[in-house]
Amino acid sequence: MGIIETQYDLEKDLTVVKATGKMIADDFHNWTDQYYRGTVTNVVLWDIVQADLSELKTDDIRDDAKRTEGLADGRSGGRTAIVTGNALEYGMSRMLEAFYDLESVPFEVQAFHTIDEAMQWLGVKD
């Protein structure tokens, strides 16, 4: 089980999420359920550079897209950037992008190799 830490910068309408350790599907499901019951921002930055996603399966990623679609109306038009640390995490994040498109999740998702690229795409300035 991994660790997910969440920080908010409400002036920038930004949530920064950092995942570390060996992640399982329930880590993400629990975070998603908790997030959408609380403070929701228009832009979200996921930092998974120190996360190990090797336990996740394609079905887990598809299920995440379905679960998120049912909860995410409040983020319509928003953006989520995922910063990855290696080829596995980048590929899985790209797969998540595709599943979110298929499920018509109401916000954009894109994977990046650096936080700077992600923040630029999110439109967040220091």
What is the predicted role of each segment?
Residues 2-126:
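Amphipathic, Lys/Arg-enriched alpha-helical "gate/interface" segment within cytosolic domains
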